[in-house]
Swiss-Prot record:
PROSITE patterns: SAM_OMT_I. InterPro entries: Cation-dep_OMT, SAM-dependent_MTases_sf, SAM_O-MeTrfase. Pfam families: Methyltransf_3. Keywords: Methyltransferase, S-adenosyl-L-methionine, Transferase. It comes from Mycobacteroides abscessus (strain ATCC 19977 / DSM 44196 / CCUG 20993 / CIP 104536 / JCM 13569 / NCTC 13031 / TMC 1543 / L948). This is Putative O-methyltransferase MAB_1361c.
């Protein structure tokens, strides 16, 4: 176990950021269900940051790839407008049932969430161009390029994209690493970098967040 004295300043900062965020009982219950399902919920600090992005982006229409058990959705909804709608996509029906339970426990009106079951590669093309304020991708790193390529057209001018898992477990910065997850996160970063409409930043929370705003 690493002691506080052995941690780098960056590790200490991240630990402090995570410890500074508290979650209510509803989010905590959703987190517990996510762990039971193996859904890999976002950390509290990542959730809080998603709430901030939802608010800053306008928060009227948000699309999420990777519903999980609803932890990230609860955080996103907390930052969205009262009339904002979260569209969230997941291939696992059990995940979406758990998320629906979380939204109900949080007394979120059914009209504010649209849960779509299916593969994101098939769902995203059915959504309208330039109709969303924020795109959140929380999925397997190897799939990030496909989801980003299919979702980037959904963003209105001034919108933003946030990709969770952008560090691939810390391996993305290792020049010798070339497994599918590392290749995926690097390709997603390249797509953003090559698109002149976006300004991007890598944030060292959770498993790394790649965030970018569209001009």
């Amino acid at each position: 176990m690493t002691s506080s004295a052995d941690r780098s300043p960056v590790e200490a900062m991240v630990s402090h950021a995570e410890g500074a965020i508290s979650e209510d009982d509803i989010v905590a219950a959703a987190r517990e269900r996510a762990v039971d399902l193996g859904a890999g919920p976002v950390t509290p600090a990542v959730g809080a940051l998603l709430s901030v992005f939802a608010r800053l982006s306008g928060g009227k229409a948000v699309v999420e790839v990777g519903t999980g058990a609803g932890v990230s959705g609860l955080w996103l909804l907390s930052g969205m407008r009262e009339d904002g709608v979260l569209t969230t996509i997941d291939v696992e029906p059990e995940h979406q049932r758990s998320a629906k339970q979380a939204f109900s426990e949080a007394s979120i009106a059914p009209s504010r969430t649209r849960l779509i079951g299916g593969r994101a590669q098939e769902v995203l093309p059915r959504l309208a161009d330039e109709s969303y304020d924020l795109l959140v991708i929380d999925a397997a790193p190897a799939d990030q390029p496909d989801f980003l390529a299919g979702g980037i057209r959904l963003l209105r001018p001034g919108g933003a994209v946030v990709i969770h898992g952008a560090s691939a477990g810390g391996r993305a910065g290792d020049p010798s690493a070339n497994d599918p997850d590392v290749v995926g996160v690097r390709e997603a970063a390249r797509i953003i970098a090559d698109d002149g409409r976006f300004t991007a930043v890598l944030i060292p929370l959770g498993d790394g967040l790649l965030a970018a705003t569209r001009d």
